[in-house]
């Protein structure tokens, strides 16, 4: 698994560019193949969510997982290419609600923008045949089949408080081979591709920056190496409302200065002597106070 420069994903009219991707060099069933995993601390919305990512296939003709939930009962929720190179989306949870495309995706030189939009809630108003939507390069896939349609308010396995994988079915099977860029998971909202891309001047589909919220278990993976460490570095950090790692300092920092850049608020100073939960205000004369919502820990790069 490695970061690759020059993905050649064209930028949109906004000037937004995706200039790096993550390469998955998986084998069919090798436990040594690379993949990513995450386990939510608590379950999110299992009726309504959106997954968006860019994929460039590296090999064809085998089962390859994009995103999956590893269930103890083996009833995985899973999004994958099958051996005939169609896209499958299995909701999991003990029911065979499985949606698949008729088109086959067999061009290893092309980038595909994939959006999987789920809404089984009655409030969403979707027909049972339309609760699972797949979009490819901005277009909804209507040439499709299914083994069974989900019932209203059905809760699939993805977004449970259990292990999820990117690039593998369960850590032992169906490893992805290819490149992936810009993965967004939106918890609690069923979106369309226009939240992530737009049509260019020549009819091509191009990425744009996502500006919405992510919900409880949502996340954004840019798959981008965003710094180069050369000794001591000063790092500025743009928050997104979630817990994130700040790297690029080149060492384990002894002092962190946190301040708002687009809103009013106190400037908070943290140091290794007092600890990550003790802060001072640089713009006030107050004594130190205990605060756990800004800095989690001091760690080495």
Task: Identify what each model region corresponds to.
Residues 48, 67-69:
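Glycan-recognition patch characteristic of GH18 chitinases/ENGases
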Residues 1-16:
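Short, intrinsically disordered N-terminal pre-domain segments
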Residues 121-123:
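Short glycine/acidic-enriched loop and turn motifs that connect beta-strands
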Residues 9-11, 19-35, 39-40, 57-60, ...:
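Surface-exposed molecular-recognition determinants
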Residues 4, 63-67, 141:
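Local beta-strand/beta-hairpin segments that build beta-sheet-rich folds
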Residues 48-52, 111-113:
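Intrinsic-disorder/low-complexity, polar/charged segments enriched in Ser/Thr/Lys/Arg/Asp/Glu/Gln
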Residues 127-130:
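Short coil-to-beta strand junction motifs in C2/discoidin
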């Amino acid at each position: 698994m490695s970061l690759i420069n020059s993905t050649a994903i064209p930028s949109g009219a906004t000037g937004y560019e995706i200039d790096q991707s993550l390469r998955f060099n998986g084998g069919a069933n090798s436990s040594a193949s690379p993949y990513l995993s995450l386990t939510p601390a608590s379950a999110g919305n299992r009726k309504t969510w959106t997954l968006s990512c860019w994929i460039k296939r590296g090999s064809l003709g085998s089962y390859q997982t994009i995103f999956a939930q590893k269930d103890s009962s083996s009833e995985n929720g899973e999004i994958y290419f099958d051996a005939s190179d169609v896209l499958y989306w299995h909701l999991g949870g003990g029911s065979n609600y499985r949606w698949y495309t008729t088109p086959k995706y067999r061009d290893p030189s092309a980038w595909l923008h994939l959006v999987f939009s789920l809404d089984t809630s009655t409030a969403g108003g979707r027909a049972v045949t339309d609760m699972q939507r797949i979009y490819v390069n901005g277009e909804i896939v209507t040439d499709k089949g299914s083994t069974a349609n989900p019932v209203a308010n059905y809760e699939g396995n993805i977004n449970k408080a259990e292990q999820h994988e990117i690039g593998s079915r369960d850590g032992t099977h169906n490893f992805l081979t290819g490149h992936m860029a810009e993965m967004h998971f939106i918890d609690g909202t069923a979106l369309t591709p226009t939240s992530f891309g737009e049509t260019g001047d020549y009819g091509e589909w191009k990425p744009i920056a996502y500006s919405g919220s992510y919900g409880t278990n949502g996340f954004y993976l840019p798959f981008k190496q965003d710094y180069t460490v050369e000794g001591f570095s000063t790092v500025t950090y743009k928050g997104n409302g979630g817990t994130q790692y700040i790297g690029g300092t080149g060492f384990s920092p002894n002092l962190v200065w946190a301040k708002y850049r687009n809103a009013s608020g106190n400037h908070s100073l943290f140091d290794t002597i007092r600890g990550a939960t003790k802060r001072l205000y640089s713009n006030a004369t107050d004594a130190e106070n205990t605060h756990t919502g800004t800095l989690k820990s001091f760690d080495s790069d």
